[in-house]
């Protein structure tokens, strides 16, 4: 049986009680919002801790009863059955508390920059990129999030060669961060007359939306160019230089934005994307340096890693990182069953974190 850090739990309960006391006092509107939000985050853990301690005390009483030689056989049998049930409940509570105490990703509550790019497979890859975007769009709607397209380059027969969107909602990065990587589709294209299955792919990048304080970008490190926006055939589509291209010289990261007629809006959007990409590149560098450690985690987050296959003829979706197959492809593509994959990935990630803590102990 795993043990819990009782001293840490005492501090947690004391902090929770102090927050409740603050809430009863006269506090300003800003403090009220902050305190109620923190309490809502702590409440499930606090309830689990209280339940765990109650179960622990009840088990202690049962053990005393069982150790008493005067306890009658019928009472002893009832006590042993109750102890077995309480043992199982205690183990569940311990696991729940240990998971809740895991270090939180500082970016988990952030909005997301979602980038989807068609890969190998030509037109079919563009169509698949469109399918993936709609899947995330529908999933976001089910979570109560909003999705705003920042930039889109449409495919010749539909879908997207590339699409960048901002997903706004509490916990968006926590839910979507394991979606980064290569998604592969196997299906018969509408244009295929022989019924042959084609394989194509699209790359998904999920980046947390970062702020100026998260990434230090010096103005001297930027090369900013303005130009006239161009259409699909290369022709200029307006007479003003509203398009923006920003190059971050130290990393070589380039962001081009021309979707708005406003140069100011294009520049703001480009800077938002640039900040997210620079932050992500630094995280990728740090992760590579800890590659041995990350072998125990859910995938590497490597953009070139094939993470999932969508097989339309068989109606299945397979996530290769956790060897999970769901025969619910229509529901996954509709965003309805995507949560099952995300929850399984999160559980696996938490299990790996717990194992690492155990090894470090």
Curated annotation (Swiss-Prot):
Listed Pfam families: PCRF (PF03462), RF-1 (PF00472)
Modified residues (N5-methylglutamine): 235
Keywords: Cytoplasm, Methylation, Protein biosynthesis
Tree of life domain: Bacteria
InterPro entries (alphabetical): PCRF, Pep_chain_release_fac_I, Pep_chain_release_fac_I_sf, Prokaryotic/Mito_RF, RF-1
Subcellular location: Cytoplasm
PTM summary: Methylated by PrmC. Methylation increases the termination efficiency of RF1.
GO CC annotations, alphabetized: cytoplasm
GO MF annotations, alphabetized: translation release factor activity, codon specific
Gene3D superfamilies, per the entry: 3.30.160.20, 3.30.70.1660, 6.10.140.1950
Function noted in UniProt: Peptide chain release factor 1 directs the termination of translation in response to the peptide chain termination codons UAG and UAA.
Similarity comment text for this entry: Belongs to the prokaryotic/mitochondrial release factor family.
Name of protein: Peptide chain release factor 1
